[in-house]
Amino acid sequence: MDNEFEMLKAGKLLIASANLLESNFKRTVLLMCEHNDEGSIGFILNKPMEFKVCEAISGFDEIDEPLHMGGPVQVDTVHFLHTRGDVIDDAQEVLPGLFWGGDKEQLSYLINTGVIRPSEVRFFLGYAGWSAGQLKDEFEEGSWYTADASNEQVFTDEYERMWSRTVRSKGGDYCLVANSPELPGMN
């Protein structure tokens, strides 16, 4: 399991290694939306919150889907991933057909008028962020893996199995890691 930092870029999955026990990132799968010399930004895909979007964010009364914890940075900010960069201004393409952000008021209007379906958007509170060099150091410590991302992974609701399935999809020795207990010392 070589250092995979060089393969990391926007549009890739960042997967917490089994050794990463820090509570914010334990067994998480993140979508990286920005990765450059200045730092990195991503969103945790498998940490839904108890709140629904319609309960927590004004203007999105039609979205009866869970709000997600995007990460521990600026948890008072709302972010969204979506598939409708064709109609949302200022959206940044992360993967072919998958976009980050854009005009939130325009998004609200397009959802409320039925142009965009709620299933085409995922909302996050906060984000995961790393300063220049920080994530590279964490890779060297063995804290992270990478994998290719797909729109299906971003919008799945199989949160409980996302980490093990994503690790297992890497094949080889990763299959053993995917089946490891959460607290290996407790065996």
Swiss-Prot record:
Belongs to the UPF0301 (AlgH) family. Pfam families: DUF179. Signal peptide: none annotated. One of its GO terms (cellular component) is cytosol. It comes from the Bacteria. This is UPF0301 protein Cpar_0662. It comes from Chlorobaculum parvum (strain DSM 263 / NCIMB 8327) (Chlorobium vibrioforme subsp. thiosulfatophilum). Gene3D superfamilies: VC0467-like.
